[in-house]
């Protein structure tokens, strides 16, 4: 089965983490901290210092940016070069030309593969199918990004049409049994496989497994049923996510009963002394955290944890359809189908990991519960014994508020994090670890979708230009607030045969050279002696700038700094994972491995040696006192065990719902959820009558892989401690440590068994096999610092 890259359907760990911590205010507490170690000498290229200065200025100085971006202005004498320098995309009509040109190339490849009959022809099947995948992704991924991001409605519509055309063709290919059979012949011929590169073997295996998942080997009637079920799931899933509703939409109280809640918030929802609170949203969450009246908190808690009957029905129907699909595809469960190509490999292995992690985490949670109980017993207004479900957030909030009152340091943190200095810091860190830096590059007319977008070229000390990064980081009306990393074009080797094909296109005047035509005008490099299309990445954030004529730069909160580091972790994986084949480039790896580089980057964001590279006051140039960060980190981790317990139980719930249980006529999603809370939790269990699982929208996107968030947190923490020495003695900025991470993990993209990557980077052969024992070992490592 051929797949487009597209944004991952699961929520990245930063987003999940923000949901967990959104109920907490900004607060600080004292903790032990260490002074930053001296930073190693910088042996960078002569142009690096100029790039470093310019990098800060293009983000922090509006005047400098206005001068720098003059070249991007379009005029009669300077026609547009096309979005991302894709020569087809100079106007809306170009999307159709781009799609049709790519479609014709794809059809020629399909014909070639289907007609293969000699050993020499079969030898090219894996690489041909990889190029076929690349041609689909070139249109689908880029068009999907443009239709969601571009401000011009005509361009959005054109991108949507191009997307639909290529997506439809991709679905046709996924039911073309001849492609699967030809791949099977090639893989079954030892003489052919012996001549393949390691990447070709991996890609062939990936494609074969994907074809199997699409039930391509089933009889026609069953295959048609598979397609019908897949279509139903694709309709029920979004319907469940988009239209989930609570059993009660509002609760009404006398405003006098809401003592403790922000009076401004209460007034916003009050009419004639009656306060009407929506049961979904910020007001209800704030009430549970702050209202002193326990009975009011209980009523609001019950309503916020109870989905409507129709919502729960949709959820259970989705789970049933997925279970039927798995059975039809000859799998025991949907989890077994989904996990076969992941690091976990099986539901049993995920269970091993989660149970080991729960065991490690349980004693931490018990300590947190004891602290909450102690605080509750000191409260004269407490009206019930023990810790109730509606007490947890309230007393957590009270404890954090009591600590916050002793220090206000973190309120001033943002003054040390102008966006330009943070981008400088990322470039300096990547230079020290991996020998690559971010170099501002003037854009051509029509190259970007908004005048705020900055282009950065990624320059390697050894390989020259290795990637293009488009940064759309500032807030504007109508823009999505969600941070994201998009791969617009993957790394891939361009063959001599492709250049010969491209020579016909270069003759039409659209392209100057065959090399340019082979990659639609987008960035390429021949530094390694082989022509490659370069990774082209878009980074989206929503950082607020000062309005009017203020010269103050965009200042980031520490959480926003962590978010930017996280997203750049995805980017560096794409940048360093420059493989010869598209299917395994960069972030195209196992779902439960994809977040590792980005979660690891969050550790760097909090390290004193890394922060000393860039964190300085935007006005005084004073270096950031690290104790301010240490206090912020201590507060963020104050109830980390409880957060982790919730994630463990939700991961177990995801597995249980995607087992064969939904096929039983007595399947009851509420009973399963409450039973998992009872069995594995130290926190209070949801009371009877609630059914929160109806709000668990990630069940559709994750589909058996919700554990990935926890799994990659554990892996990242272990690598941080073992490879980078937890930042001690300058380990976070040491080139040798960065080289080990690059050589064992990042450079492979998805072209190597991730368990081998893990065993190699940790020098721990115990986990190389990736079996249930390995999963249990990983679980025992825990997530707590």
From Swiss-Prot:
Residues 1-27 form a transit peptide. Keywords: Hydrolase, Metal-binding, Metalloprotease, Mitochondrion, Protease, Transit peptide, Zinc. Its cofactor is Zn(2+). Gene3D superfamilies: Collagenase (Catalytic Domain) (3.40.390.10), Neurolysin, domain 3 (1.10.1370.10). Residues 26-52 are annotated as: Disordered. Its EC number is 3.4.24.59. One of its GO terms (cellular component) is mitochondrion. GO terms for molecular function: metal ion binding; metalloendopeptidase activity. It is found in: Mitochondrion matrix. The active site is at residue 567. Zn(2+) binds at residues 566, 570, 573. Pfam families: Peptidase_M3. GO terms for biological process: peptide metabolic process; protein processing involved in protein targeting to mitochondrion. It catalyses: Release of an N-terminal octapeptide as second stage of processing of some proteins imported into the mitochondrion. Binds 1 zinc ion. Belongs to the peptidase M3 family. Cleaves proteins, imported into the mitochondrion, to their mature size. While most mitochondrial precursor proteins are processed to the mature form in one step by mitochondrial processing peptidase (MPP), the sequential cleavage by MIP of an octapeptide after initial processing by MPP is a required step for a subgroup of nuclear-encoded precursor proteins destined for the matrix or the inner membrane. This is Mitochondrial intermediate peptidase. It comes from Sclerotinia sclerotiorum (strain ATCC 18683 / 1980 / Ss-1).
